[in-house]
Amino acid sequence: MIDAIQSIGAFSAVKETEAAGSSSSASLATPGTGAAAPQAGSFAEVLGNMTTDAIRSVKSAEGVSLQAIRGEANTREVVDAVMSAEQSLQTAIAIRDKVVTAYLEIARMQI
């Protein structure tokens, strides 16, 4: 079920953005000192990792649910896995809402 989501190709857009961001991250050195700022990862990289973790969490919950149907997992394991997947999904929805709100606010700005 979740495999269909991965085939959409959203990760290719993240990789393109990441490649564009990596060329500009080299210019983040502190002026005058010659020392580079510590690399924390680009925004696209962080979002990509969060998306991958969310997908992994949902897949895990699906797997545990199937194990419970076969009688190989107990109810507590299923509930824990589903709650973790739900938390990941709610986080992804909240981030999406914030990004959309920021985009709409930028679109309303007068130039």
UniProtKB/Swiss-Prot annotation:
Keyword Cell division: no
InterPro entries named in the record: FliE
Pfam families, per the entry: FliE
Gene Ontology annotations of biological process type: bacterial-type flagellum-dependent cell motility
Subcellular location: Bacterial flagellum basal body
The keyword Heme appears for this protein: no
Superkingdom as given in the UniProt entry: Bacteria
Main subcellular location of this protein, as a coarse class: other
Record-level GO cellular component terms: bacterial-type flagellum basal body
PANTHER family xrefs: FLAGELLAR HOOK-BASAL BODY COMPLEX PROTEIN FLIE (PTHR34653:SF1), PTHR34653
HAMAP family from the UniProt entry: FliE
Protein family membership: Belongs to the FliE family.
Protein name: Flagellar hook-basal body complex protein FliE
Organism this protein belongs to: Sinorhizobium medicae (strain WSM419)
